[in-house]
Amino acid sequence: MAIDDDISFLERVPTLSLLGRQALRILAIGAETRYIHSGEVLFKRGDEADGAYVIQEGRFNLSSKDGRELTVGPCTLLGEVALFSETRRPATARALEPSTVLRIPRFLFVRMLDSFPEAARKLRESLAARLDQATREISNVRAVLDAHEPK
């Protein structure tokens, strides 16, 4: 894909769409395109994560330690947390068909945020809203569990 095509694609990825075209240009230029065969493992649960992947084409099966599975496809950002901090992969990602991904290394993402403070602000606000929503959902689940707890 040409750089402008990659930028247009990245604009369709929910988290990345907040960043703006110039910030996405940095990511598109520095991202690595990887072609993955059907059945090939992109990463394994427990692997060190030094960046994220955006699925351009194809589908992946994500399997977690507890046996849960999820199928994801184009415009999915895999490993979002790894863009911000050192972490390990929480699941294994295996291609279900020939697939293409863009690998965004953490150092590139951090450099982009340093260069585009407005993009960093928008991203911080979005992540704060998502964290707030997750906290409310956890509180709701806890309230339901507490209501059913034997006294």
Placement of each model-derived feature along the sequence:
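Cytosolic regulatory regions built on CNB/CRP/Popeye-like sensor folds
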Residues: 1-151
